[in-house]
Amino acid sequence: MKLLTNKIIEDFEKQGLTGELPDSEKKVIAKYFFPIGSTIWYALEYNPKENEFFGYIVKSGHNELGYFELEELEYVTIDGLRVERDLDWESNTTLEEVKRGDKE
């Protein structure tokens, strides 16, 4: 599965930097998850020069904003399983909705 498509890159470019926006206006462009375990990466921004995302990371009940790399997502493998992109994710979902638990 391709984790980063041209369409997703275009959506990141349209949104731009989100630092000054309220959570209700920050669009979560892509959602990545590991099939076993509880880690979810909600990507808000993407820096193509660094192949790095900025987003909201949920891991074992600890939620934080931070950076994560595309390479990190592509190469993590446990028992033959890899990180996947949620193909049904709606990129108009806001960070506020994710934090409230309205969208998972």
Please describe what each predicted stretch is:
Residues M1-E104:
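Catalytic phosphate/metal-binding cores of nucleic-acid and nucleotide-processing enzymes, i.e., regions
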